[in-house]
Amino acid sequence: MSDALIRLEKVAVRFAGQNVLDNIHLSVEPGQIVTLIGPNGAGKTTLVRAVLGLLKPDSGSVWRKPKLRVGYMPQKLHVDPTLPLSVLRFLRLVPGVDRPRALAALKEVGAEHVIDSPVQSVSGGEMQRVLLARALLREPELLVLDEPVQGVDVAGQAELYSLITRLRDRHGCGVLMVSHDLHLVMSTTDQVVCLNRHVCCSGHPEQVSGDPAFVELFGNNAPSLAIYHHHHDHAHDLHGSVVKGPVTGQPHVHGDSCKHG
């Protein structure tokens, strides 16, 4: 286990007698990017809570490197509109952070211009960068990013993915990222894990950045995107339970009614 930052083995979580997670095996190593994908209700948020230590599994184990430093970027930040909170004051909620450190973190993510702005006035894309800067202020060995590109168009996704890759390269941290997109993922992902209560399949993404039409559409950020092809050996019913019996015929092709997207 010495090479891993975090390792989950046979993790299961049950709510109201139903399995939300079942027999989950997952690990993240320094410098490794793992992207977690899956349909709504697949257990992605529950898995992130287990990784962060906010939820204890009903069975299985979650091992963390001793004194592991984790930087967490939530999907959204809900702030009372009447609360007088600037971006600087928000970042200084991290212990030991002063203005120079906050400014340096914002510069690293390209958002230094909002340092004195009220958090309520910052745009969605800028707020994502502020949340990423806050995660970096913890000098993390592991970055946990919960849908960092939610609500961002494909060009914006490519730009953010490129930024995350640069941060990984600069800091050498491991990255566990949750994505709402079941097929388009960050090209530098080392492993894609498809979750639907259990690990349905996993593998490497296929780069599409070499396609001239793709490059023309997304420019310099095209290499940040890749397609992930699912290779499921089973199916799920309408309740998300595994349908017993072997999968026969051609490899699974996703349709509009498919639980996996």
Swiss-Prot record:
User: What UniProt keywords apply to this chain's record, in alphabetical order?
Assistant: ATP-binding, Cell inner membrane, Cell membrane, Ion transport, Membrane, Nucleotide-binding, Translocase, Transport, Zinc, Zinc transport
Molecular function per GO: ABC-type zinc transporter activity; ATP binding; ATP hydrolysis activity
GO cellular component, alphabetical, reads: plasma membrane
From the UniProt record, list the reaction(s) this protein catalyses: Zn(2+)(out) + ATP(in) + H2O(in) = Zn(2+)(in) + ADP(in) + phosphate(in) + H(+)(in)
- Supply the Pfam families for this chain: ABC_tran (PF00005)
Describe the task this protein carries out. Part of the ABC transporter complex ZnuABC involved in zinc import. Responsible for energy coupling to the transport system.
What quaternary arrangement does the UniProt entry report?
The complex is composed of two ATP-binding proteins (ZnuC), two transmembrane proteins (ZnuB) and a solute-binding protein (ZnuA).
Which PANTHER family does the record associate with it? Answer: METAL TRANSPORT SYSTEM ATP-BINDING PROTEIN TM_0124-RELATED, ZINC IMPORT ATP-BINDING PROTEIN ZNUC
Designated name of the protein = Zinc import ATP-binding protein ZnuC
Species per Swiss-Prot/TrEMBL record: Pseudomonas fluorescens (strain Pf0-1)
| Highest classification ranks of the organism | Bacteria, Pseudomonadati, Pseudomonadota, Gammaproteobacteria, Pseudomonadales
